[in-house]
Amino acid sequence: MQSVITDVTGQLTAVQADITTIGGAIIVLAAVVLGIRWIKAQFF
């Protein structure tokens, strides 16, 4: 039973790291899109 709990804890830690990475990528992508829209608004 202890090894199952350890395995689940390890998997949750890995998933949490993946979620953090994906969240950061989404924020960066949104910032880039907003920057491009702002630059376009300056010229048009």
Curated annotation (Swiss-Prot):
GO cellular component: helical viral capsid; host cell plasma membrane; membrane
Origin superkingdom: Viruses
SUPFAM superfamilies: Inovirus (filamentous phage) major coat protein
Protein purpose: Self assembles to form a helical capsid wrapping up the viral genomic DNA. The capsid displays a filamentous structure with a length of 760-1950 nm and a width of 6-8 nm. The virion assembly and budding take place at the host inner membrane.
All ranges on the Cytoplasmic side of the membrane: 40-44
Membrane topology classification: Single-pass membrane protein
Keyword terms, alphabetized: Capsid protein, Helical capsid protein, Host cell inner membrane, Host cell membrane, Host membrane, Membrane, Transmembrane, Transmembrane helix, Virion
Coiled coil: none
Positions on the Periplasmic side per record topology: 1-18
Major subcellular location class: virion
Gene3D superfamilies registered for this protein in UniProt: ATP synthase delta/epsilon subunit, C-terminal domain
UniProt-annotated location(s): Virion; Host cell inner membrane
Organism classification: Viruses, Monodnaviria, Loebvirae, Hofneiviricota, Faserviricetes
One Pfam family per UniProt: Phage_Coat_B
Membrane-spanning parts: 19-39
Name of this protein: Capsid protein G8P
InterPro entries reported in the protein's UniProt record: G8P
Homology family: Belongs to the inovirus capsid protein family.
Subunit structure: Homomultimerizes. There are several thousand copies of this protein in the phage capsid.
